[in-house]
């Protein structure tokens, strides 16, 4: 490669060739043709395209591209990236990982070289396991998100047997230090992959953890990692999902062994499987069933499965059994069932805790920006407020958004009148909340006399203006759940193009 080769790479062509490899791996894995899977994976790992994509991800696309590992190396120039591509191969080695503590959790930062190797492995492993993963696993998987899990729970709560089961029981569970305590031998045995990838994954799992790196006030020390998958690695979410894969299928088989719990005593095996819903997002999951006895026994069965497999335990503080009529929280939402006549309706709202977190975050931003201009304050608050609204707009959000809009307005009004005590209130109001203006947001025109606005001049003395949209301007929508067996690697471009268009439109509305 010449020094200009990086800029002249035809990335759409490279991506399309990688996609063809991954589609073939996915389909071979679906057919349980292990020999074919391994052959295609080997070709992919050795291809120049895969190495280019892996290096691009860790040096160009990733937000952590300028964050060094223990070798203090970053790859920013085209020449450095080209050299990394030439040298990239799975050698079964891994440098110690740098541990950074955010709040109470530790994030592990591998070197850029190890990140590139992880990205290379991910290209080969992910399509194989996407063909195997269970229908209702949604965390850290391509093409799936929190809203798919939300809708799956809603569908499960709405479905009932027609035998006066107007509520269900929910096991809302979490796993204690899931990613930090997964058994290495269990994970590697379950992975069952090519020798070069197996030895490389072992090296990453066993890589030492370097504490207090770049902290001159503390002594640097390296400790051995004897269990768990380091959080922060590109491949870590996939390894976590592999370790927990099988939980849903196990519980579906388990429920079939239980005696019939219906009045008719005619529950078939298929009906029993459908009666139990297991919906997982990473290390948090819910079990839903109409019989509390089944839920009580299911909790014990899950504890047994976790202990005898990945060597994990349920987090008793995060685990509870609830009645759906009382409501429960999951992924920031509150789910509750309401009986109306002969029908059961499932309602989803932003949880009270999620609302409190938003108000606290807005308050903290305002307090940190007491002397900032309105323009700068809006620049910080807008992505927070609009991002929160776009996440929760797929629930029953209208009244919640109205309440939060009022609370945020009170904070903003206090900030405005506190910073300017020399002028009259009408003058201050007109300066920060101009009257008679129209605003376009989400393709809709809004006219409001209490919208916080700000102005600034750029380097060319051009006046720039911004404003803070109200939460209520974000309209509620219905989320369309992903089809259970679909994957971005399945080759169904028409299906994924339609979903991508929906996401693009969502992003455009978010930016407006």
Where are these regions (language model features)?
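Short, solvent-exposed helix-loop connector elements
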Residues: 105-110, 224-228, 347, 363-376, ...
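Non-catalytic, peripheral interaction segments enriched in hydrophobic/basic residues
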Residues: 373, 377-423, 427-431
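Charged boundary/loop elements
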Residues: 3-64, 123-139
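A conserved non-catalytic segment of reverse transcriptases
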Residues: 206, 210-215, 309-374, 379, ...
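Conserved polymerase palm-domain catalytic core
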Residues: 87, 135-136, 148, 152, ...
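Phosphate/adenylate-binding "loop-and-lid" substructures adjacent to NTP/NAD/dNTP-binding pockets
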Residues: 38-48, 52-104
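Extended C-terminal regions of large enzymes
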Residues: 411, 416-512
């Amino acid at each position: 490669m010449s020094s200009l080769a990086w800029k002249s790479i035809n990335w759409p062509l490279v991506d399309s060739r990688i996609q063809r490899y991954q589609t073939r791996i996915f389909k071979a894995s679906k057919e349980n043709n292990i020999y074919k899977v391994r052959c295609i994976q080997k070709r992919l790992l050795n291809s120049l395209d895969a190495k280019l994509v892996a290096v691009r991800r860790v040096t160009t696309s990733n937000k952590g591209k300028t964050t060094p590992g223990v070798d203090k190396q970053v790859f920013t120039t085209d020449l450095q990236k080209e050299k990394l591509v030439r040298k990239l191969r799975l050698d079964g080695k891994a440098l110690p990982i740098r541990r950074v503590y955010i709040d109470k959790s530790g994030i592990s930062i591998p070197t850029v070289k190890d990140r590139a190797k992880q990205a290379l492995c991910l290209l080969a492993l992910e399509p194989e396991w996407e063909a195997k993963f269970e229908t209702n696993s949604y965390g850290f998987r391509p093409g799936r998100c929190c809203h798919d899990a939300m809708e799956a729970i809603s569908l499960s709560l709405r479905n009932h047997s027609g035998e006066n089961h107007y509520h269900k029981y929910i096991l809302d569970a979490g796993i204690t230090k899931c990613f930090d305590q997964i058994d290495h031998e269990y994970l590697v045995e379950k992975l069952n992959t090519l020798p070069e990838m197996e030895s490389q994954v072992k090296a990453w799992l066993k890589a030492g953890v370097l504490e207090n790196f770049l902290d001159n006030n503390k002594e640097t020390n390296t400790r051995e990692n004897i269990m768990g998958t380091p959080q922060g690695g590109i491949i870590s979410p996939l390894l976590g999902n592999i370790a927990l894969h099988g939980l849903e299928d196990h519980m579906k088989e388990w429920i079939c062994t239980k005696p019939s719990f219906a009045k008719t005593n005619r529950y078939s095996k298929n009906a029993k499987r459908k009666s139990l819903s297991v919906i997982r997002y990473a290390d948090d999951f819910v079990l839903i069933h109409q019989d509390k006895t089944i839920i009580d026994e299911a909790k014990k069965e899950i504890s047994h499965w976790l202990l005898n497999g990945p060597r994990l335990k349920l987090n008793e503080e995060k685990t509870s059994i609830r009645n759906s009529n009382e409501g429960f929280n999951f992924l920031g939402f509150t789910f509750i069932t309401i009986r109306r006549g002969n029908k059961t309706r499932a309602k989803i709202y932003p949880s009270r805790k999620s609302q409190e977190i938003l108000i606290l975050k807005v308050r903290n931003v305002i307090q940190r920006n007491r002397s900032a201009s309105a323009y700068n304050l809006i620049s910080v608050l807008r992505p927070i407020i609009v991002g929160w609204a776009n996440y929760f707009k797929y629930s029953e959000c209208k009244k919640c958004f109205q309440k939060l809009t009022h609370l945020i307005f009170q904070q903003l009004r206090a900030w405005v009148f506190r910073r300017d005590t020399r002028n009259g209130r009408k003058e201050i109001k007109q300066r920060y909340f101009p009257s008679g203006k129209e605003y376009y947001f989400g393709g809709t025109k809004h006219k409001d006399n209490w919208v916080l606005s700000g102005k600034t001049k750029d380097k060319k003395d051009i006046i720039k203006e911004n404003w803070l949209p109200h939460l209520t301007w974000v309209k509620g929508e219905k989320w369309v759940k992903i089809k259970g067996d679909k994957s971005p690697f399945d080759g169904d471009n028409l299906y994924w193009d339609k979903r991508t268009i929906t996401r693009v439109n969502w992003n455009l509305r978010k930016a407006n």
